[in-house]
Swiss-Prot record:
The active site is at K187 (proton donor). It is found in: Cytoplasm. Pathway: Cofactor biosynthesis; (R)-pantothenate biosynthesis; (R)-pantoate from 3-methyl-2-oxobutanoate: step 2/2. GO terms for cellular component: cytoplasm. Keywords: Cytoplasm, NADP, Oxidoreductase, Pantothenate biosynthesis. The keyword Membrane does not apply. The keyword Transferase does not apply. This is 2-dehydropantoate 2-reductase. It catalyses: (R)-pantoate + NADP(+) = 2-dehydropantoate + NADPH + H(+). Belongs to the ketopantoate reductase family.
Amino acid sequence: MRITIAGAGAMGSRFGLMLHKGGNEVTLIDGWPEHVKAIKEHGLRANYNGEELTAHLSVELQSEISSKEKTDLIILFTKAMQLDKMLQDIKPLIDEHTKVLCLLNGIGHEDTIEKYVSKNNIFIGNTMWTAGLEGPGKAKLFGDGSVELQNLISGEEETAKKLAEILSESGLNAKYSNNIHYSIYRKACVNGTMNGLCTILDTNMAGLGETKPAHDMVVTIVNEFAAVAKFENVNLDIAEVVQHVETCFDPSTIGLHYPSMYQDLIKNNRLTEIDYINGAVSRKGKKYNVATPYCDFLTQLVHSKEELLKAK
């Protein structure tokens, strides 16, 4: 299958590498010139569960897409605030048969995608895989993970199941979900706790879990997400979601991982996606007249940190 990874950072590199290993024709597209140059010159290098691998993949700079060949599937991994620009830039690769799978962190991205892609070709999901970048063209890929996905509108269930099958053939453990909005909110609770808290506290997830207030902070933030989700007909099982979030503390699985927001801001001095995670809950709280004080404050803290570090 001809697959384009739109946003080839840490997670895009993981999916690109695994789909390439699975026999698909993969093209990476990214906006970081040094990263694209490194992959063109040396291949995508990865520490893959302790094994050093190099994959020679097609790669293009987002602002200089030369290919006019249409793609079968686009997997969106760009940063949320860059989604609209990415979709503009990859328009030449999209036709009426191109499927678009959004696996971005956060809530409500389909509203942006619909401006460029017909609803019957849009699929949304989330992933529990983790990944890191050690530098341009160099990924660190440890642990196991999974993907859940669903068609945006009814009638495309079989296509969604086929996409899950294609991803699973490359070891990505994908499955069809008939309630993806629940899964997206559940995953957003992971990001809404681990990302902001680890970034502000300058620790990995296991370190956060060792602090005495960690459990109370997780419970409070999950309750804020759940209160907003209820207004969108998503009823989170709060106890189950809290338990799920706190599995991230385990150092024998992914606890030693630094979340993507930490990598963006603390390691790479980049702006974060906080406005699409806790910030989204904060905005929706105002819309639905629901108090979200922890999400409000965490959003302000992260933006303050961005300013202090002069993130770009």
